[in-house]
Amino acid sequence: MELKDVLAISGQPGLFLYVAQSRNGFIVESLLDGKRMNASASSRISALTEISMFTEGEDIPLAEVFTKMYEYTKGEQGPSIKEGNARLKEFFGVVIPDYDRERVHDSDIKKAVSWFNMLVGAGMTKFEIPQE
């Protein structure tokens, strides 16, 4: 599994692994329960390699955020999203100290940590963007 094959679909919980292209969109597999479904071409689908986080300087790719989280947690999952916004912001602030606190909302941090935990739980250890 590579990060370029992991997708977020608007309106659907969790992350999905790209399996194949279908006549009407994509066949994806949920990382939460392993079920496959058809994601229509009209769905808002984003590859995780296309997402970035606001910082005080240049925006950084989500792959770099995940790499820093992985190094900080030494390969373990991050804090549970049930621990509350204060704990998640503290964790995120340690991992990405220069994130833009005005443009990165609590929900963004919660989603990033949740996605990171899903990927680590699924066995992903490298969060690299493939060079083209």
Feature-to-residue mapping (PLM):
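Conserved phosphate/pyrophosphate-binding and hydrolysis machinery centered on Walker-type P-loop NTPases
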Residues: 56-59, 78-85, 102-109
